Regions:
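Long, contiguous internal "core" modules enriched in hydrophobic/ aromatic residues
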Residues: 1-167
Length: 167
């Protein structure tokens, strides 16, 4: 037996659905802009301060065990990627890792967040956060929150697809 709240109507339910849909579109559009900026600034600042494979050097990171896990995750994302630029790199080069500017584009936002949090404190980490007008600790927290919100959106979308598929 399905119960409805008193005074509920199809119009009320539809208006809530429309509002929810528009809010989700707005949030994901803005999150995508932030994601592109984070990828770009991370690749640009770190590659200009160090070199193209800086992310492979344990010297730049707080925790070597966490760094090894990050490299493993990057390698997993590299092996599973179906991006054309990744396929072209694999075809042309035998390097185990892509240059950082390609790696930052290919990696998940979650991986980038973990990578940023594991960077040694200092000028480079501060420079990335400063681009966004934030102290590095606040930026790290916001980046983690953005990953969380984005994951909620993705899970919601996947659940919606499953519901429609099963219906």
């Amino acid at each position: 037996m399905i119960l409805f709240k008193p005074c509920s109507t199809f119009d009320v339910a539809y208006n809530i659905y429309k509002f929810d849909s528009e809010l989700r579109k707005l949030i994901i559009t803005e999150l995508e802009k932030i994601e592109v900026a984070v990828r770009t600034q991370t690749a640009y600042i770190l590659s200009s301060q160090w070199d193209g494979d800086w992310f492979t050097d344990t010297f730049h990171f707080n925790n070597s065990v966490r760094h090894a896990r990050i490299l493993s995750k990057i390698d997993e994302e590299y092996q599973l990627s179906d991006e054309e630029f990744v396929k072209a790199f694999k075809f042309k080069y035998s390097d185990p890792f892509l240059p950082s500017w390609i790696t930052m584009e290919m990696s998940s936002l979650d991986t980038l967040s973990i990578l940023y949090n594991n960077l040694l404190p200092g000028r480079v980490k501060w420079s990335i956060a400063a681009y966004f007008g934030l102290p590095d600790t606040v930026f790290a927290s916001w980046l983690h929150s953005i990953v969380y919100i984005r994951n909620i959106y993705i899970i919601w979308k996947l659940n919606l697809l499953v519901i429609f598929f099963l219906a």
